[in-house]
Amino acid sequence: MASSSNWLSGVNVVLVMAYGSLVFVLLFIFVKRQIMRFAMKSRRGPHVPVGHNAPKDLKEEIDIRLSRVQDIKYEPQLLADDDTRLLQLETQGNQSCYNYLYRMKALDAIRASEIPFHAEGRHPCSLMGKNFRSYLLDLRNTSTPFKGVGKALIDTLLDGYETARYGTGVFGQSEYLRYQEALSELATVVKARIGSSQRQHQSAAKDLTQSPEMSPTTIQVTYLPSSQKSKRPKHFLELKSFKDNYNTLESTL
């Protein structure tokens, strides 16, 4: 009886150790999986290194091309010219359910205006990643075609643009027409200034390329009076006297 109890106690100890080891292994696996899971969530990059097991040159080329992705910015045209929703806007434009179409048209109007918002003279679709208001006001204060444009006109344009893009209020037909009028006026002023500046540059280049007419050369001869002809410099007289003395000395020898 005692031997059987000792055997059962030994079995219990073994079972306890086995179950304890199993629980410890399961807890270790669970904790490890949770740590790896949170580590993957916090990582911004891919779970597998880019270019894994690739040659060094190929891996560098992949990294260079991936670094250029963040500089790629594109904003497509919201409403195509043949969009069927434009017909609905023309027939039922006064209804408030179509206000989102006026917002889309307002953003596309920047593209259609062809105003050189960039100082380099390019015609961007829009100013992505920039504050349109501060950028346009900066152009107004610099030596660009925007210099001196009325602040009220720019404020009207920018208020309409920001309301159409970011605002939560009503942007219907009347707001769009007011915005379009300000945009057309600004485009007219800027294009007129660009045209006058180009004409000035062309006229200046034309003046530089034209060779001046050759005027006939005149030769002016000044005759000295006889009293001034006899006047010679003092050093010339001294040189002549030295030459005469030298000739006299040479003849005596």
Swiss-Prot record:
Main localization of the protein described in the UniProt heading: membrane
Free-text note regarding domains: N-terminal region is required for phagocytosis of Gram negative bacterium.
Taxon lineage: Eukaryota, Metazoa, Chordata, Craniata, Vertebrata
Q: Which domain of life is it from?
A: Eukaryota
Protein name (record): Protein C1orf43 homolog
Which Gene Ontology BP annotations are present?
Answer: in utero embryonic development; phagocytosis
* Annotated transmembrane regions: 11-31
Pfam families, sorted: NICE-3
Which keywords does this chain's UniProt record carry?
Answer: Golgi apparatus, Membrane, Mitochondrion, Transmembrane, Transmembrane helix
What is the native source organism of this protein?
Mus musculus
What's the stated role of this polypeptide?
General regulator of phagocytosis. Required to uptake Gram negative bacterium by macrophages.
Entry keyword annotation includes Mitochondrion: yes
Instruction: Write out the GO cellular component annotations.
Output: cytosol; Golgi apparatus; membrane; mitochondrion
Q: Where is this chain's protein located in or outside the cell?
A: Membrane; Golgi apparatus; Mitochondrion
How does this protein sit in the membrane? Answer: Single-pass membrane protein
